[in-house]
């Protein structure tokens, strides 16, 4: 689909995110995460994400209750939750479940499909290094110029949002489930979702 057509697609509705994160995570695979940068469109097909189930999930940021840092997760579904980790990169999530239940999806990897040169430049890479542009949550955020100051609390369902998720009609993908990466609590739960066979997923663990 041409870049201009992607920009004209409506974002996924709030009802899409007002569900169990396990369902949302599986159904996000194959959808397009899109950033508008002025007249430019930066976009990638979602090939990897992780579900966080709310207060009952020991690995979730919401497990210890509501704080100033994680307040977005406790609000309505469909809002961007951005946090800074390891002192060097941001991670982008979207809130799920009804208001107050604090579920979420962490975006882990994209297959770049539009604005590739701009995304590569954001990562200080060449466009030919396609697999490295957004394979991993920190790389993904950097490629789309996501920061906490700019994007935390942003309504990704609003048609006016410069950060949204759209369905371009790509169709069904083969989904694989694996344990989540980089956590020590609830580490055995199969809540990481990947597009089977995609070369753009992060790392090689559980592939």
UniProtKB/Swiss-Prot annotation:
Its EC number is 3.2.2.-. It holds the Pfam family Pur_DNA_glyco. It is an enzyme of class 3 (hydrolase). The lineage of its organism: Bacteria, Pseudomonadati, Acidobacteriota, Terriglobia, Terriglobales. Keywords: DNA damage, DNA repair, Hydrolase. Belongs to the DNA glycosylase MPG family. Gene3D superfamilies: Methylpurine-DNA glycosylase (MPG). It comes from Koribacter versatilis (strain Ellin345). InterPro entries: Formyl_transferase-like_C_sf, MPG, MPG_sf. One of its GO terms (molecular function) is DNA binding. This is Putative 3-methyladenine DNA glycosylase. One of its GO terms (biological process) is base-excision repair.
